Swiss-Prot record:
Subcellular location field: Cell inner membrane
One Pfam short name: IspA
Taxonomic placement: Bacteria, Pseudomonadati, Pseudomonadota, Gammaproteobacteria, Oceanospirillales
Membrane topology: Multi-pass membrane protein
GO cellular component: plasma membrane
Protein name: Inner membrane-spanning protein YciB
Chief localization: membrane
Keywords, comma-separated and alphabetical: Cell inner membrane, Cell membrane, Membrane, Transmembrane, Transmembrane helix
Amino acid sequence: MKLLFDFFPIILFFVVYKTTNDIVTATAALIPATAAQVAFSWFKYRKVEKMHLFALVIVVILGGATILFKDDTFIKWKPSVVCWLLAVVFLIGGWVSKKNLYQRMMEANISLPQHAWSKLNYSWVIFNTLLGALNLYVAYHYTQEQWVNFKLFGMLGLSLVFALMQGVYISRHMVEDEPAPSESATGNGDNKSF
């Protein structure tokens, strides 16, 4: 359900584009959908994920420019701007604190050695940098319709494959919690034999 919630604005953008074949109309649907996502999160949970708020600001600025100038260049840059800013946040996050951003987000759920946290964090930097570049390549070398398809299916598909690869990496490097000593091992249990 959370995945659908996170991708609701882009799915709506895709559907509106496919039904109208007009990127300005699709962008005009994307802006309020992103705002509704933020508002829903606030009213339901009394908090807004920073990523959703960040996406709203970028969508309003670049989407607004797309609508104002009737130029799809701005909205085509939006995924790249988001990816590159995320890469910068992941990169700088480790420099300003003892723990990198990925570790701070995930350490409550999993335990990994420090080198694994670092590799995961840097892999997000590299992935987002490359995904942002790939988005612009598709935007400038393919048709608008192909870019819209890539924005939903290509970027989402690559993100899911990357997340699965991260899951495999994590499973290979997880630190097992020490099992609690059993009572018989500590000598505290009843050792009755019949």
